[in-house]
Every structure is written in C-alpha cells, then in structure tokens.
C-alpha cells in the first residue's frame, strides 16, 4: 500500500513538473519570439521572460535531481552530484524569488491608485530600472550561490576525505545543512519575500478599495469594469497564496525535516514546486498577448484532433 502511494505521488509530481516546464517554456518562447521580432521588450515582458526562464530551469533541475537521487541514492549521497545540484538549485531559486518580487512591484506601481509623492515618483522611475534590477538580481543570486558553495564545500570535503561510509556521509551532510544553513537561507529569502509581500498587499488593498468604490457608485457586479477588477484581485490573491506556500515550503525544506527516506517526501516536493508549476498558467491567462497565442494553439490542436 505504501509503495502504491509513493508511486502515485511520484506520478503526480511528474505530471505537475511537465505542466510547469511546458507553461514556463511557452512563456519564454512567445516572448523570445517577440524580442527577436522587434528587438526590444516592455518592462513587464522582460520580467516575465526572465521569470519563465528561471522557473523552467529550476523545475527541470528539481525534477532531474529528485528522480536521479531516488535511483542513485548511494552514489549521489557520497559524491559530487549533491554539490552540483545545490549549486544550480540555489542560483535558480534565488533568481526566481527576486524576479517574482520585481513582478509584484511592477504590478503595484502600474495598477495601484496611491497618491503619495514617493509612490508617484517610483511609478514614473521603476519601469526604466527593470533591466538593471533583473541584472542585479542575477548578480546577487550568483554571489549568494558562491557563498553557499564556499561555506558548504570544505565541510563536505573534510568528511569525504575521511572516507566515511555513504550513510554516514549522508547523515553528516544533512546535519551540516540543518544546523548552519536554515538561518542563512531565511535571511536571504526573506528580503525578496518582504518586497513581494509589501507590494502585493498594497496592490490588493488598492484594488479592493477601488472595487468597493465602483459598487458604491452604482456599478453592478456584472459590470465589465467591476468584473475586470474582481478577476485581477483573484489573480493577485492566488499569486500571494502560491508564493507564500513556496516560501514556507522552502524554509521547512531547508531544515531537512522531511528527508528522502520520509514517507511524505514526494507530497512535500509537490508543495515545494507547486508555485512554479501553477502560477505560469495564471500569468498566461491574465496576459492578453500570451492568452491570444495560447488560444491559437488550442484551436490548432483542436483542428488537428478533429481532422
């Protein structure tokens, strides 16, 4: 029974990963084609293509890691594969967090109806900063990755040189990561999460007040403008829930509370990667350009299926 449940969650994780890879790849391809055609991208499209690319690679790395580890646990636990995976995973995860934060800030400055002078100044200046913020996010993520590697590698090497058994090496690796890294990861990940949280809450509050004001002025719930604001609110709340779930999952995952030997490992991996698999679809359906191309592909697929 336990083996059947494990197989079920592995299959569910695989399907979720395929959906995430396909959706993020779709965003990158559509906006990449736009970039090649016109030679430039709007600030929103810059963030979306960066976020899609980082999520695509992160989902791919995470999927390969999970299945390689489950198949080659002995070699992976005692070899350099663990280092290789963590090096890429930390970089991509940090970049993804920052890109999500800048996306929320851009949404906030473009949509929120706030009249404070500082916000109005930021509303005017922020779009021009987007390319530099994205480049800075990549640089910060690279530095953070080197920091983790610098702290991590000597400790692993010391235990490997002592020729511990594979099981002993795995236990020491887990202990090192459990005792030294969660607090560091919490501090590093909390910075973009705080930026995201402030921006998204300001935007949700602004949209909520605007929707209430429209209803108070006689607009019905069926009014197109009211429906548009309601859809935007639902989209932002979904983004907030998924991002918060991803943040909490990664913090708990950093404590190694649920290891590969745990019965809940695969359900937990589903929770960890849920945001980067589901949120791309929210972005696709809420973006006119992406939704239009996606609808065309669905029509082509339907015509091919009927034919």
Curated annotation (Swiss-Prot):
Coiled-coil spans in chain: none
Tagged with keyword ATP-binding: no
Regions that span the bilayer: 8-28, 41-61, 89-109, 130-150, 184-204, 235-255, 265-285
Positions on the Extracellular side per record topology: 1-7, 62-88, 151-183, 256-264
Subcellular location: Membrane
Matching InterPro entries: TAS2R (IPR007960)
Topological category with respect to the lipid bilayer: Multi-pass membrane protein
GO cellular component terms listed in the entry, alphabetical order: plasma membrane
Cytoplasmic side: 29-40, 110-129, 205-234, 286-307
Alphabetized GO MF terms: bitter taste receptor activity; G protein-coupled receptor activity
Glycosylation sites: 167
Main localisation: membrane
Keywords for the protein's UniProt record, in alphabetical order: G-protein coupled receptor, Glycoprotein, Membrane, Receptor, Sensory transduction, Taste, Transducer, Transmembrane, Transmembrane helix
Further remark: Most taste cells may be activated by a limited number of bitter compounds; individual taste cells can discriminate among bitter stimuli.
Role, per record: Receptor that may play a role in the perception of bitterness and is gustducin-linked. May play a role in sensing the chemical composition of the gastrointestinal content. The activity of this receptor may stimulate alpha gustducin, mediate PLC-beta-2 activation and lead to the gating of TRPM5.
Family, similarity comment: Belongs to the G-protein coupled receptor T2R family.
Protein's recorded name: Taste receptor type 2 member 41
The gene coding this protein: TAS2R41
